Amino acid sequence: MQFIDRCQIKLIAGNGGDGIIAWRREAHYDKGGPAGGSGGKGGNIILVADHNQSTLLSLKYSKIIRASNGDNGKPDLSSGQNGMDKYVKVPIGTTVYDEQTNEVIVDLIRDKQEYIICHGGKGGRGNAAFKSSTLRAPNLYELGDEGEEKTVRLELKYLANVGIVGYPNAGKSTLISKLSNAKPKIANYQFTTLVPILGIVENNDKRLVFADIPGLIENASEGYGLGHDFLRHVERCEVLIHLISMNPLDHDDVIDAYEKIMTELRKYSQLLVNKKMLVVANKMDVEGASENFNKLRSYLAKKGIDISSISAINGDVNNLVDRVFDLYQKTLSTTTETNPFSIPMVAEKVYYYDGEKTIDDDPLDVIKDGENRWIVSSKKLTYWFKKIPQTTLDNITRLGQKIKSLGVEDQLKKMGAKPNDVIVICDYEYLIDE
């Protein structure tokens, strides 16, 4: 299966159904009365974290995902059926960004965790909903609200506790195959690993998830090679293993190789180099490895950094496992987290979607368009002009009350508007009352 860990999609929730005007015609209801039902609510779009998903491939080519609209009201006091919610499954560890603002909307890190990313529109009311003791036969109805619409970016960041980073061919795949049950492709050439490989490592009844990250090269943080695409997967790791080959054929200078990897981590994010890190020398079984190891160990000692040595291909990894688990436990003890997956979770934002209530109180935008003509706009005006169709006298009266309550005429008079001046709102023209 093709590995896709990033994609962009447009999400459109369902529109609310329209309310209708209808009247009771049964023989035993001699006075009739309003019977127009309200529209159904539009369907939501809901993201669901699913442990069966391992890639965003199924969403890569889904440019637009829609939920269904609510049905219109019916003429027998019945409301329209609500639109069906659309559930979108994503891998655990998916972070959702608003494509316009680049803000994190939600981090889905638990199996079956759900989040309503786009709310369906509220259904419009039918005339039966407007009946009152003072309004016995209302010729009022509303259109349904539009569903929320968002363009989002999904990024998968694996939930690994320990990340293995280093140059291509450092022996990362061999190491994770010896540590765990993972079966990565292993060969003696660069970029054998093309996607992150996860493996579960057990030690004294404890277990951690290790991630083999595709090899980094110089300028990986700027998009060269494969590493830049996958560095995000180590953002959640509590511990990093910086694996370096001691084979003289793999590097011109082992110190330079160490520093270049550290530079790429730092350029991508300072948070990566601030993580707990073990520097591990690999391929100690080859000729010339001891000289490289001693050279690097002396260099790191001046920085106060320890280095350990292994030969992953020979399975000499038990001491390394103990060190990793000890360091991980110490890392947990310095945080408030106590569970084995110490993963920071972005607080979920709560969106209340109820038509007008979601609209910020924005000021009226007034433009003088000629001697006696004024163009007025605001989000709330636009909302109510979409909500109240001007097809009945009662609706026109209600819309006029909304315009007045929003202070349109008061604002215009303060700016010098006179009676019989023309007001333009949402392409409709009106005259200012005398």
Curated annotation (Swiss-Prot):
A biological process from GO: ribosome biogenesis
Residues covered by the Obg domain: 1-159
Cofactor(s) needed for function: Mg(2+)
Domain OBG-type G positions: 160-329
EC number: 3.6.5.-
GO molecular-function terms, A-Z: GTP binding; GTPase activity; magnesium ion binding
Pfam families for this protein: DUF1967, GTP1_OBG, MMR_HSR1
Cell compartments where the protein resides: Cytoplasm
InterPro entries cross-referenced by the UniProt entry: G_OBG (IPR031167), GTP-bd (IPR006073), GTP-bd_Obg/CgtA (IPR014100), GTP-bd_prot_GTP1/OBG_C_sf (IPR036346), GTP1-OBG_CS (IPR006074), GTP1_OBG_dom (IPR006169), GTP1_OBG_dom_sf (IPR036726), OBG_GTPase (IPR045086)
Keywords: Cytoplasm, GTP-binding, Hydrolase, Magnesium, Metal-binding, Nucleotide-binding
Sites where the protein binds GTP: 166-173, 191-195, 212-215, 282-285, 310-312
Main location: cytoplasm
PROSITE patterns given in the database record: G_OBG, GTP1_OBG, OBG, OCT
Family statement: Belongs to the TRAFAC class OBG-HflX-like GTPase superfamily. OBG GTPase family.
Role this protein plays: An essential GTPase which binds GTP, GDP and possibly (p)ppGpp with moderate affinity, with high nucleotide exchange rates and a fairly low GTP hydrolysis rate. Plays a role in control of the cell cycle, stress response, ribosome biogenesis and in those bacteria that undergo differentiation, in morphogenesis control.
Subunit structure comment from the entry: Monomer.
Protein's UniProt name: GTPase Obg
Organism: Mycoplasmoides gallisepticum (strain R(low / passage 15 / clone 2)) (Mycoplasma gallisepticum)
